[in-house]
Structure formats: C-alpha cells, structure tokens
Amino acid sequence: MWLFVLFDLPVGTKSERRDATRFRNFLKDDGYLMLQFSVYARICRAEEAVDKHLTRVIKSLPSKGSVRALQVTDKQYARMKLLVGDSSKNEKAAAQQLVLL
C-alpha cells in the first residue's frame, strides 16, 4: 500500500517559503520518497499505517496552499509508467522495498 501526498504551496513571501520547506522536510523525515518536487510517496504495510501517516500529514499541514493525499495499492504503483526521464534513486529504492515486504 502506498500513500501519495501531492501539494501546491505558495512561495511568494519568506514565511510561505519557510512553511513550504518545513512541510517538505516533514515528509522526508517521515519516510516519504520525493517522486517529483511536489509529489511524495510512502510505502505502508497496512490500512492502519496509512491512517497513522495521514494523521501525521494533517497535523503538519501549512496554513495556505493545496495538499491532497491518495492511497494506492502495490499493484497499482507497479503499473505506474515513467513517460519522460529516468527513475530517481528514490524510485529504485522503493522498488527494492516492495520486494522486501
């Protein structure tokens, strides 16, 4: 099971940039992999883990912007296609995590 967090945060002022950076750092510290600059994904073992991490995200939300969460099964994640560019180190590590679970 995967939990995706997708966001679009304002960065027009210094405080907005600081809030956006704090949110991205929170996601990285909580084990999310950056797939794109504002798209992060985390592997979760069960529905309870998804709920736990979603609660953490909600507690860390910045005051402005748009943040969305999407829950995806391992099978759906494996069917994701990279259309342009190369897989990042994070994505390769995520594929290895799938094998371990």
Short names for language-model regions:
Residues 1-4, 9-101:
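Basic nucleic-acid-binding interfaces
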